[in-house]
Amino acid sequence: MQDDPRYRVEVEVSPRFLAHQSTPEEGRYAFAYSIRIQNAGAVPARLIARHWKITDANGRTEQVDGEGVVGEQPRLRPGEAFHYTSGVLLETEQGQMQGYYDMVADDGTEFTAPIAAFVLSVPRTLH
């Protein structure tokens, strides 16, 4: 079902470093990421769950799974978008996140919306 154009959701991510919430001397680097989820398909669909793989610069990986996003399970009509912002703490100046959303269309079809890997980096540390 992943290749069926009726069931397509596009995800855009904008990460940023939160210097005021970070304490580098304690190995605490805070990042926010703003997400835009748009139903680019032809059928209304609801976001049911999220699945994240978070990797820091030391190769330490954490898997985060949960229902919905920011306490919601938004239903998106074709062309409609949902925006939210969340955050993550890393022990290193750099890392990355990637994952996917579990979706279910109004006709009962289940599918996933991939979230491409994106970089989390303290400014001026990316080489």
UniProtKB/Swiss-Prot annotation:
GO annotation terms (biological process): error-free translesion synthesis
PROSITE patterns given in the database record: APAG
InterPro entries linked: ApaG_domain, ApaG_sf, Uncharacterised_ApaG
Record field: transmembrane: none
Residue intervals of the ApaG domain: 3-127
A Pfam family of this chain: DUF525
Coiled-coil blocks: none
NCBIfam families assigned: PRK05461.1
PANTHER family, alphabetized: F-BOX ONLY PROTEIN 3 (PTHR14289), POLYMERASE DELTA-INTERACTING PROTEIN 2 (PTHR14289:SF16)
Protein's recorded name: Protein ApaG
